[in-house]
Amino acid sequence: MNKFAVVEKQFEYKGHDCICIFGCLGYRCGYVSVDDNKEFNEYDIECHCGLSFSGTLPYDYGQKETYYIGFDCGHICDGNDYNLALKYGLIDEKRFNELLEMQILSPTFLQPVRSLEYVEEQCKKIVDQLEKENESNE
């Protein structure tokens, strides 16, 4: 098991492999497979706070393709769910207490934690934009 993150959901949408993970820092990320190896900043894609990843994923994410683009929900407008990180075994009790103390002082303290459903919808939104771009290039 990857001690940095767990895969909460993996699904196929319009031929793209989509992976939603929850990480040890208490927030989710979403990844979508792509056929090209462009950098994330070369895409004109709207999603939660913009794309922040392009590349290969860790082997234990169970990826079905080679290259992915993705986004994270670890921004100033996002909250952290350290309870879930503890439940998933991504952090221990000591780290949980440290993070909780720091969180109270953080500007993200009262921000919403992005749900699995939200991340799934953002992945679909990315795919829809990729497909629309492919149609206009044909």
Q: What are the residue ranges of the model-derived segments?
A:
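Amphipathic, interaction-prone secondary-structure segments
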Residues: N2-G50
